[in-house]
């Protein structure tokens, strides 16, 4: 086991200065205990092993149980940890030991998430539960709060007086790979939007917390989701779009259609692309639509947040007849702030400037900040940061139960509507968007045409990436 771990560190550790003597010292603390997670007897022997290991290394029993398992095992593991004495419920004013780290998905809908929370809270207090969302551990995502609240030049503009709309894109070139069975149950909405992209929406739209404490920051993130306008179940197709990839070419390589993937039904209506229009009903964001989209087998791998600012109220240069100027003025968002999450982490700001010459011609330019250039190529991975935070007991970058439940509640109308209605069916709503039949977008494209219709209904268009 230790040799396998060593090989993995050498193989996957980015820019690590591997020292054999350091590894040998560290490896003495690595142990492997196989067993059946559903059998109570396994936990009794695990308890004995942990006590023995603690004595051997002179440490007390402060345990973190990381549930990187199928979701169906979450409850059996937690209940067995409790019955064996390995998991003890602590008061909120007591140290949060032991701790349990839970991977997504946390439930598959609102009802299942509530049941899971109820069962877990019967065994552990909320401050002992760490629901991991690796997007919150990404450096660029963590930088959103710093960018907004540590720089006075941006926050005064961060409202509906100056911002026209916000686009959040998560695009993947990969298909479902070996996860066909899982993806059939999840789809793009549950796999990406319910957790990762909702966290991005919250970070962009949240109010300044009164401190950087875990509770203060998580309170503000949850308030955003509670302010998102609830979707009319009868008008789902006017604010939510779904798609499924067909065969095509991605980055020059041939790709099969989703329905031909392993462990995927030949008539599957599971979405591999989803796009939503959100409205946040509060003083800061009223009238500013948030467009979010996530899809597989798209043209390019990229995740970004694009904040589109409004055009100046008086188009001073609009009557000057030159090609360069007209191209700038035709853009409804001459200023766009882009926070690039992956693969190239950074921030860019697009603005108009005068092109050198005897006449006044405007040209769009971009100022770029790149993490690799400023801080070196290696930045800690999301999981490095999150695992460290779970060790030191800082839950700031973990999802709290009320956030998870609010997110599921918000998406419930879509979750219930899509399986009940085939993609090609046009709903009775006047503004409904025809989306099918599946498959409705070619692998290597930017998704179904319906997503352009969704954002185009308010005069906007997706950024060219």
Where are these regions (language model features)?
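Secretory/organelle targeting and membrane-embedding segments
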Residues: 1-102, 106-465
């Amino acid at each position: 086991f230790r040799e396998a771990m060593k090989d993995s560190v050498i193989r996957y550790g980015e820019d690590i200065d591997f020292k054999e003597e350091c590894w040998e010292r560290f490896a003495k603390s690595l142990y492997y205990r196989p067993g059946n997670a559903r059998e109570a007897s396994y936990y009794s022997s695990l308890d004995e092993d942990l006590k023995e290991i603690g004595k051997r290394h002179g440490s007390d029993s402060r345990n973190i149980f990381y549930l990187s398992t199928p979701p169906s095992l979450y409850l059996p593991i937690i209940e067995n940890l409790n019955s064996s004495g390995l998991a003890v419920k602590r008061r909120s004013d007591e140290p949060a030991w032991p701790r349990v780290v839970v991977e997504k998905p946390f439930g598959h809908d609102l009802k299942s998430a509530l049941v899971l929370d109820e069962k877990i809270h019967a065994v552990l207090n909320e401050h002992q539960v760490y629901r991991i969302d690796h997007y919150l551990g990404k450096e660029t995502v963590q930088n959103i709060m710093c960018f907004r609240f540590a720089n006075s030049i941006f926050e005064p503009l961060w409202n509906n007086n100056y911002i026209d709309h916000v686009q959040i894109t998560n695009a993947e070139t990969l298909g479902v790979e070996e996860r066909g069975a899982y993806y059939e149950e999840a789809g793009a909405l549950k796999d990406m939007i319910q957790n990762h992209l909702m966290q991005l929406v919250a970070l962009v739209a949240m109010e300044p917390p009164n401190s950087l404490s875990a509770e203060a920051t998580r309170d503000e993130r949850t308030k955003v989701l509670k302010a998102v306008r609830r979707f009319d179940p009868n008008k789902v197709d006017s604010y939510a779009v779904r798609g499924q990839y067909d065969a095509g070419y991605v980055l020059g390589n041939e790709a099969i259609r989703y329905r031909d993937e392993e462990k995927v039904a030949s008539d599957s209506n599971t979405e591999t692309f989803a796009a939503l229009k959100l409205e946040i009903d509060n003083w800061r964001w009223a009238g500013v639509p948030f467009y979010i989209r996530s899809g597989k087998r798209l043209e390019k791998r990229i995740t970004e947040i694009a904040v589109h600012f409004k055009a100046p109220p008086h188009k001073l240069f609009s009557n000057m007849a030159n090609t360069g100027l007209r191209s700038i003025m035709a853009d409804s968002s001459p200023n766009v702030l882009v926070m690039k999450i992956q693969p190239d982490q950074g921030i860019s700001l697009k603005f108009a400037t005068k092109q050198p010459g005897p006449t006044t011609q405007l040209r769009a330019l971009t100022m770029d900040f790149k993490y690799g250039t400023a801080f070196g190529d290696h930045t800690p991975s999301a999981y490095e940061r999150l695992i460290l935070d779970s060790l030191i007991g800082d839950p700031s970058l973990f999802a709290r139960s009320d956030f998870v439940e609010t997110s599921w509640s918000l998406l419930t109308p879509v979750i219930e509507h899509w399986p009940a209605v085939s993609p090609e069916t046009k709903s009775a709503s006047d503004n409904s968007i025809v989306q099918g039949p599946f498959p409705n977008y070619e692998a290597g494209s930017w998704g179904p045409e319906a997503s352009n219709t969704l954002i185009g209904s308010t005069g906007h268009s997706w950024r060219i990436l």
